[in-house]
Amino acid sequence: MLQQFIGQSSSSLNNSINTAVILAAGRGERITGGEEYSSKPLIKLYNLSLIERSIKKLSDKLNVNKIYVITGFKHDKLKIHLDKLKKKLTVDLEIIFAKEWEKGNGASFLSVLNHIKQKQFYLLMVDHIFNDEFYSTISKSKINNTKCYLAISKSLSSMHDYNDATKIKITENKITNIGKSINEMDGFDAGFFVLHSETFNNIKNLSEKKFLSLSDVMQELIQEQKLYFIEVTGGSWLDIDTKKDFSNAKDFLLNF
């Protein structure tokens, strides 16, 4: 019913968006064990690195042809891998190093907004994986081409960690709160956004904070009543933060 509301209040299908941003700047210490030589985006699931899997899915399922990859930790190592993918894939990949990546993924995102030439784009984290059902829902959703959306699920699968999941609160058709410690919640952040660059014109000063998560950035949109949602199912997405999550991800991909 929530998803139906989105369709009724929107103006165009999602097939006009051809650009995506992948956040791949963090350390990923919980899954790498803090090993300094490890790079989370390069971790392989069934012979595909997390970053290559994200790129291929965006291209194959959403017809994305321009992808900005935001790097930070182990930038040089990741760049070597991405340069190889440039020769192998038909997608136009642009690698952007976020100088302030250690301040959080929110700071990394805000620092590269000026590089993104397209007004509306997808945003996702490299450690989130999605099945075909998820991408189908996104591609069929009707959206307003001037608004921002977050994919949310009203429930979680058994593979998710409830305590670690980011919760959201909804009032009518807008997200009114986001965070991991929300008591009265209506759903869960699936880690996939449809964003409009001009929406962030008034909040770029947030990057002056010592630490800034992506949820902090989205909280600013929420305060301005500018964050809407697209509903997906709880079993259509998974975030990979720990070694247990990595094991679950193998089962998740087998059950596509």
What positions do the PLM features span?
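N-terminal nucleotide-binding beta1-loop-alpha1 segment
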Residues: 1-36
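Short catalytic helix/loop segments, enriched in acidic residues and glycine
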Residues: 37-53
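A short, N-terminal amphipathic alpha-helix
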Residues: 48-64, 80
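Short phosphate-binding loop-to-helix
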Residues: 77-121
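Short beta-strand-to-loop acidic/aromatic patch adjacent to the donor-nucleotide binding site
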Residues: 119-129
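Conserved core of the sugar-phosphate nucleotidyltransferase
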Residues: 131-208
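Donor nucleotide-sugar recognition loop
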Residues: 206-216
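Catalytic donor-sugar/metal-binding loop of nucleotide-sugar-dependent glycosyltransferases
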Residues: 219-232
